[in-house]
A protein has these predicted regions:
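Conserved phosphate-binding elements of NTP-dependent enzyme cores
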Residues: 1-836
Length: 836
């Protein structure tokens, strides 16, 4: 019998067998992916890594899992189409952690997202000392959990112990004033009269111009306010009437602007504040909100002080503090506080307290491992950086202690400082120890070198990729000369490709200066940024890079350029000669299938004009507008120019398939007949052009100057492998970021500041070199480039480095070191310096 058991164990499959994968650019590949191991997938951007990991392994794993559920359940899930692959054997149920977790809503906090708040609410419901209706506190008792009656020992009144649900700010425990969001929108008095040198007749009161009839100035005059003197010369009483005057009916004479006819009316006075409040109450859509928004400001809710909780939910006490205070502690302190909870209670409550606290501690430990110990539970999830949100997702996945699941991690190193990666590795090994498998798509050599097996895709991007070039253990891959990642894993590749600038010359072209007060966990800062140079902002996760650049510098510069008030925490900002500030981040471009590479890069309009001038088009009287696949006559009549149709299958999810009429080209048959003949005698139709990749199209468009230039820019950005008709929503983060840059390159930029938020996301070390050349091109045009980055290769190429830290959260938020690469390396305080 023992032999039989042994035999059974050895027959277990060791690999996921993929045969004939053709998703996106995969070239019909066969590959065996080891199970119960960390399998890295590397390769240049666009070489087919995500196609293999997400398009084949995850798509099939999640689809098969869904197909094993009942039809009824499946109807409620979004359907997964079958991947284009001959067969995939032994794939486990799969979970994917995407590059960019969605931005959470206003009601989501670090506590709700990690579900730590659930355990904490349970503690406060079952273990806390509750308050009787007359304000006396009752000592903690087991009667709460047993749902027995509790009487106050002081006055004998019946005590109601709130359930965990009644302590939730998204449910019954919400503060009635702000509805559990912690902030209220109030009218910003400063914005109502932006220019007090104007008189009311000249339009000094802004909301009356845009949100109200212009008659209000006449009514205001009847209220006893002088409307023909500059606003600043009005008495306090007159200003009070403008801002807060009563809603009285007045009889006014008015003259119609157009006809010059006089008339009389009874009209009720709306003061400036009420005008805004009234408009806010009637807002129905985004556009209406935009008009009102500029007169509002977000304030912390005066009733709950931003804690989001009602008075009753803030009442229970545990170890002397309420739930609101517990949520304000950084995780590190909260963990120590929770550890002391059981001992603060009567003996008979210990077993229950220990089990509740233990469930809290296991989740918290994971988050601490991933370097999130500095976040407090009440931190709004929307204000976290991408990396922080992704690690929240990861911790949630690990907590469930599942087994036999395939985790597909898409670039988990995003937003991780080299010193945080150690914690990530520990989490991956725990997942494997529980009997799971991991697929890891990444470029960070520090993470890839943890993999037990590496599959390298390539050799090029786009059409030239989609093959497996090498696979094996890390030493095996390094030994193979065809491997492109090998030299970077072995650290033999040379990464310094920009000439460094001498320290004396760095600030020669001028500088920007930023001065701020404290906000979040960032202390007050004074920062200089050299103009016309490549400045990199570094530091561990949570050290305040995002806050300094995205919440202080950019809004400050924008406000200064538009002549608006600086954000509250920004004291001053000097930026001589700067006229534009552009943030280039990696958020996806458009969620619409109608947006393509050609439309985004402004090539499509030019192509339509060219085709409208051909003899074929003139004979059939087609104009440029007819060549649009969105609205023109020549779009495909079946799919309306989207290139795909949705099939409605009874009881099953809708399936999107390429349009049978146009084959995905988006154009009707007539469009294929209109061709342009170039000097080499080659004939192309517009649908054919849209199917070319940028590199091929460059050859075909040599005589069209504008199109050629624009495509050349895409090629120089390393996007030569994208087809012109490719949908922009399907691009990876790194591709989206570089496509946004396309319109900026190639013109003088001495008055512009470009800010990049982790541009190396999705970039192979070889692509990083392309990116550095792009930065150099911007700087050669006179631009100032500021980059938030963890990638050591980019940091090594910086002219000037600002290192934040030293830790994350409360331990961070200061500038630890500034200077050139050599100065940072030599600085003992800089954590980043140690890794350089």
């Amino acid at each position: 019998m023992e032999n039989a058991v042994m035999e059974y164990e050895t027959n277990e499959p060791k690999h996921i067998k993929v045969r004939g994968a053709k998703v996106h650019n995969l070239k019909n590949i066969d590959v065996d992916v080891p199970l119960h191991k960390i399998v890295g997938i590397a390769g240049v951007s666009g070489s087919g890594k995500s196609s293999l990991a997400l398009g084949v392994l995850y798509a099939e794993g999640s689809r098969r899992y869904l197909e094993s559920l009942s039809t009824y359940t499946r109807r409620r899930m979004t359907g997964a189409a079958k991947a284009q692959v001959d067969e995939v054997l032994y794939v486990p149920a799969a979970l994917a952690l995407h590059q960019r977790p969605g931005i959470p809503g206003i009601r989501s906090t670090f506590g709700t997202g990690t579900e730590l708040l659930n355990s904490l609410r349970l503690m406060y419901s079952r273990l806390a000392s509750h308050r009787c209706p007359n304000g006396h506190y009752v000592p903690p008792t087991l009667k709460v959990a047993a749902e027995q009656e509790i009487l106050c020992p002081e006055c004998g009144a019946k005590v109601h112990a709130p359930s965990a649900e009644e302590l939730a700010f998204n449910s019954q425990g919400a503060c009635p004033k702000c509805g559990g969001t912690g902030s209220v929108r109030t009218v910003d008095l400063d914005s109502l009269v932006p220019d007090d040198s104007l008189s009311i007749d000249e339009g000094a009161v802004a909301p009356w111009n845009s949100l109200m009839w212009s008659l209000m100035t006449d009514v205001c005059r009847e209220m006893g306010v002088r409307t023909d003197v500059p606003f600043r010369e009005l008495t306090d009483r007159e200003k009070e009437i403008v801002y807060h005057g009563p809603a009285e009916k007045k009889h006014i004479f008015y003259k119609a602007k157009k006809t010059n006819q006089a008339g009389e009316l009874d009209f009720t006075y709306f003061n400036a504040v009420y005008t805004v409040e009234n408009a806010l109450a009637k807002v129905k859509d985004e556009k209406g909100m935009k008009r009102v928004e500029k007169f509002l400001k977000e304030d912390i809710c005066p009733e709950c002080g931003g804690s989001r909780l009602s008075e009753a939910a803030r009442a229970p006490r545990l170890r002397g503090i309420g739930l609101a205070q517990a949520c304000q502690m950084p995780l590190k302190e909260l963990v120590d506080w929770v550890a002391g909870v059981p001992d603060s209670l009567p003996e008979e409550m210990h077993p229950m307290a220990e089990s509740i606290c233990e469930s809290f501690q296991t989740v918290a430990k994971r988050l601490m491992d991933l370097g999130l110990s500095y976040l407090s539970l009440d931190r709004a999830a929307a204000s976290l950086s991408t990396g922080e949100r992704q690690r929240m997702q990861l911790a949630r996945a690990v907590r469930n202690r599942t087994t036999g699941v395939l985790y597909v991690l898409d670039e988990p190193s995003i937003g991780l400082h080299p010193s945080n990666i150690v914690g990530l590795n520990a989490v991956m090994h725990d997942l494997i120890a529980d009997g799971n498998s991991i697929i890891l798509v990444d470029h960070d050599t520090q993470i890839l070198s943890e993999a037990d097996w590496l599959i390298e895709m390539g050799p090029e991007a786009g059409a030239g990729g989609g093959y497996v070039i090498t696979q094996g253990t890390i030493p095996q891959v390094i030994a193979k000369k065809e491997s492109m990642i090998g030299p970077f894993l072995a650290q033999t590749a040379d990464m310094r490709i920009r000439k460094s600038v001498a320290w004396e010359e760095i600030f020669a072209p001028g500088k920007l200066h930023l001065s701020t007060d404290a906000i979040h966990t960032v202390k007050p800062l004074e920062i200089d940024i050299p103009k016309g140079r490549l400045t990199v902002v570094t530091g561990v996760s949570g050290s305040g890079k995002t806050t300094m650049v995205l919440e202080s510098l950019i809004p400050g510069l924008e406000a200064k350029l538009n002549g608006e008030h600086l954000p509250g925490h920004v004291k001053s900002i000097t930026a001589e000669g700067i006229a534009h500030v552009k943030l280039i981040d990696a958020s996806p471009i458009g969620i619409n299938v109608r947006s393509t590479v050609a439309t985004y890069a402004n090539v499509h309009d030019e192509l339509r004009k060219i085709y409208a001038k051909t003899a074929d088009a003139k004979n059939k009287k087609y104009k440029a507008g007819d060549f649009s696949y969105n609205t023109g006559k020549l779009r495909c009549p079946v799919c309306d120019g989207t290139g795909q149709i949705s099939l409605d299958v009874q009881f099953l999810p809708d399936v999107d398939v390429p349009c049978p009429e146009c084959g995905g080209s988006r154009y009707a048959r007539e469009a294929w007949e209109i061709c342009y003949e170039n000097k080499q005698g080659m004939r192309y139709s517009l649908p054919q052009m849209m199917e070319m990749d940028v590199t091929t199209a460059l050859q075909a468009t040599q005589e069209w100057k504008v199109v050629h230039q624009r495509l050349e820019v895409l090629k120089n950005l390393g996007l030569g492998y994208l087809t012109l008709g490719e949908e922009t929503p399907s691009l990876s983060g790194g591709e989206a970021q570089r496509l946004k840059l396309a319109s900026e390159l190639g013109r003088g930029q001495s008055d512009s500041v470009f800010v990049f938020d982790e541009p190396t996301i999705g970039l192979h070390p070889l692509d990083v070199q392309t990116l550095l050349q792009v930065f150099q091109a911007l700087i050669d045009n006179g631009a100032t480039v500021l980059v938030i980055e963890h990638d050591l290769d980019v940091i090594r190429n910086a002219d000037y480095i600002i290192d934040m830290g030293p830790g994350g959260g409360e331990d961070g938020g200061r500038v630890v070191a500034v200077g050139t690469l050599e100065q940072i390396k030599a600085d003992a305080d800089s954590i980043t310096g140690k890794y350089l």
